[in-house]
């Protein structure tokens, strides 16, 4: 089973429609997968609930916040169940409080499994000017995450020192999930050593050949990794947008980096991985799948590990 720990299904459907695609959720999720869908405004969140209840779950009357895909069977062990989870947060690129009341209502009624995306984005001058507002909504969301004891899903670009500044508060949360982690193994280790129950979600940067992310996939603590597509975002060079099914290529390359290595590569990190020619820069997920050679046993070992991490990060239990 695959894990897509961060994606935007409503945006994906809209993107498909804008380029002449069907924009239907059935085909992208025809493979077994558990998902965490991220929303930033109430209309997007409500679309998620309708999309999955009607098209995937077949049960529009389900009262649960953890909607289980139609392939699941209730008596299966947790490791084999497929889940659709929802997160909601005020994004640092639009750090306004218009949706704060809606977010708090979701928290009070236990309709979401995490707060996020939240965090900081200092990627360009426009976003840097929003830093005071980003700090305000970040503080508010951390306070609520502690109050309701929910994980946070972190968006961070060029702002990791600000996240480190919040370590005393992050330590009080059940889990901290770094969406689209692009940092180094050393930075990731630092969060863990400081007592943060952190998970690091790896996306299509492993297909772009981003050295630090490939090093994470290759040799970082296996109990701390997740996988994602961020669909329809995080596209590769030859792709108009990302598909949810790209999680298959992300997973294959992560497993490839982790298992198709010599013992010397295992011990010496990203430089050795690159020298061993395991790191590749693919222009599309399709091209990646055509080239990656990894046996099914290795894929299963890797996905079983990611499923366990997903369940732990989001507090799922039988």
Model-derived features: positions:
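Mid-domain alpha/beta scaffold segments of enzyme catalytic cores
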Residues: 1-318
């Amino acid at each position: 089973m695959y894990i897509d720990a961060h994606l935007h299904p409503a945006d994906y459907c809209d993107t498909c429609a804008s380029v002449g695609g069907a924009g239907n959720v059935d085909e992208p999720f025809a493979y077994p997968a558990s998902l965490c869908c991220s929303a930033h405004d109430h209309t997007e969140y409500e679309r998620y609930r309708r999309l999955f209840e009607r098209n995937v779950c077949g049960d529009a009357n389900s009262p649960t916040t953890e909607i289980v895909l139609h392939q699941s069977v209730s008596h299966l062990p947790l490791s084999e169940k497929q889940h659709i989870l929802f997160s909601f947060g005020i994004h640092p690129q639009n750090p306004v409080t218009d949706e704060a009341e809606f977010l708090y209502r979701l928290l009070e009624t236990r309709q979401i499994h995490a707060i996020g995306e939240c965090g900081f984005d200092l990627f360009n001058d426009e976003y840097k000017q929003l830093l005071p507002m980003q700090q305000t909504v970040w503080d508010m969301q951390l306070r609520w995450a502690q109050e309701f004891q929910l994980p946070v899903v972190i968006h961070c670009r060029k702002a990791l020192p600000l996240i480190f500044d919040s370590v005393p508060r992050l330590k009080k949360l059940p889990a901290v999930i770094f969406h689209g982690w692009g940092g180094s193994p050393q930075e990731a280790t630092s969060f863990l050593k400081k007592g943060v129950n952190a998970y690091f979600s790896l996306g299509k940067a492993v297909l772009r050949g981003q050295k630090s992310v490939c090093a994470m996939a290759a040799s970082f603590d296996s109990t701390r990794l997740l996988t994602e597509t961020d669909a329809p975002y995080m596209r590769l060079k030859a792709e108009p947008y990302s598909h949810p099914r790209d999680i298959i290529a992300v997973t294959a390359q992560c497993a490839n980096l982790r298992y198709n290595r010599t013992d010397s590569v295992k011990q010496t990190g990203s430089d050795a991985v690159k020298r061993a020619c395991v790191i590749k820069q693919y222009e599309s997920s399709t091209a990646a799948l055509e080239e990656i050679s990894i046996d099914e046993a290795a894929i299963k070992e890797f996905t079983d590990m990611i499923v366990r991490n997903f369940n732990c990060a989001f507090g799922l239990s039988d």
